[in-house]
Amino acid sequence: MARITVEDCLEKINNRFLIVQMAIKRVHQYREGYDPLVECKNKEVVTALREIAAGEVMPADSIEEAGVFLPATK
């Protein structure tokens, strides 16, 4: 597979700091038992970045309401 970077995710999310926070939150979700939304055999952080670049996870309108971004289904 091709390499994935934060720059690849900037097409979907215009804030690189939010992208990093989203990826961290997503890795925590994997460790809590959530399934990945894209097929990827890389490390968890790479899988999270692939999900963001694919538009599978998006930031929530209200961070207080939904955490850092809209949760994926379990």
Curated annotation (Swiss-Prot):
Keyword Transit peptide among UniProt keywords: no
Keywords: DNA-directed RNA polymerase, Nucleotidyltransferase, Transcription, Transferase
Catalytic activity, as annotated: RNA(n) + a ribonucleoside 5'-triphosphate = RNA(n+1) + diphosphate
One GO cellular component, as annotated: DNA-directed RNA polymerase complex
EC class name: transferase
Enzyme Commission identifier(s): 2.7.7.6
InterPro entries: DNA-dir_RNA_pol_omega (IPR003716), Pol_omega/Rpo6/RPB6 (IPR006110), RPB6/omega-like_sf (IPR036161)
Listed GO biological process terms: DNA-templated transcription
GO MF terms held by the record: DNA binding; DNA-directed RNA polymerase activity
The family this protein is said to belong to: Belongs to the RNA polymerase subunit omega family.
Function: Promotes RNA polymerase assembly. Latches the N- and C-terminal regions of the beta' subunit thereby facilitating its interaction with the beta and alpha subunits.
Assembly notes: The RNAP catalytic core consists of 2 alpha, 1 beta, 1 beta' and 1 omega subunit. When a sigma factor is associated with the core the holoenzyme is formed, which can initiate transcription.
NCBIfam families: rpoZ (TIGR00690)
Protein name in the entry: DNA-directed RNA polymerase subunit omega
Gene: rpoZ
